[in-house]
């Protein structure tokens, strides 16, 4: 565990290419490592938009999705276009009743907050994406968190 965490801090973000996404994704063994990967490495790579697209996909698995959401919340210039797939991930997990749905909801909230506090255009994109969510428990979590984080 410690070696995996250390590797995330030692790796050079400038050298992480799309060809290595699978390698790093396979190393995400739990939510702690996924969150640390987002913080220490993934949010700093030049190919982050490509990583986000690959790891937010429905078949990417919840650990990669969580890492993508947490990293997206930390990139210097998050894209408002990421709000819709973030909401879709939460909805998919909530509808499938996977145990990690709330974790994905918290990842989406982190991204939504990073986006929604930048400017009004991003805020509106977040509100539209979050507004597409229903009232399943993980979806309700997103609504509740955004209500106070974005003062909705």
Predicted regions and their residues:
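Alpha-helical scaffold domains
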Residues: 1-152
């Amino acid at each position: 565990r410690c070696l995996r965490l250390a590797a995330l801090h030692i790796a050079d973000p400038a050298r992480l290419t799309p060809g290595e996404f699978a390698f790093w994704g396979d190393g995400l063994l739990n939510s702690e490592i996924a969150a640390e990967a987002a913080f220490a490495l993934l949010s700093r790579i030049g190919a982050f938009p490509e990583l986000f697209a690959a790891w937010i996909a429905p078949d990417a698995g919840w650990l990669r999705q969580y890492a993508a959401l947490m990293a997206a919340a930390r990139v210097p210039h998050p894209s408002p276009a990421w709000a819709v797939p973030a909401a879709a991930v939460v909805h998919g997990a909530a509808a499938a009743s996977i145990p990690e749905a709330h974790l994905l909801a918290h990842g989406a909230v982190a991204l939504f907050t990073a986006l929604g506090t930048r400017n009004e255009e991003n805020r509106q994109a977040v509100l539209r994406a979050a507004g597409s969510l229903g009232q399943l428990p993980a979806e309700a979590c997103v609504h509740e968190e955004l209500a106070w984080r974005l003062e909705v």
